[in-house]
């Protein structure tokens, strides 16, 4: 889920990176409290689903500007939670959109695309995510099984 402002200090004490940066305001708050370089992933809601977090694709440029202007944040890549659909073409289209955003930002910043990770895909759709360029997948269900009610 999203990182709440009142949890930033706790998060900074126990994480090596933040994968849920979704606004310039949050970037500013994290930067003000960080004491060293902190890799961050911009979370983008490419599915457009109201139940998903992340900035809109149209807001990515402003968020990248905030990260670039910060003293402590280092852009490590992009993250999304996939479309909740059994239709491969739809899920892959959303992942392809995030890859396209990453590629545009890499070109704008003058870095290699491979310098910016893509964190996308979970146990149910990891093959589709990898096919679309994922470099990080989240495999909780595959490792630990279904959540208990």
Model-derived features: where do they sit?
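Conserved alpha/beta-domain cores
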Residues: 1-126, 130-132, 144-146
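Short C-terminal tail/terminal secondary-structure segment
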Residues: 139, 145-149
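Active-site-proximal glycine-rich helix-loop-beta segment
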Residues: 133-135, 140
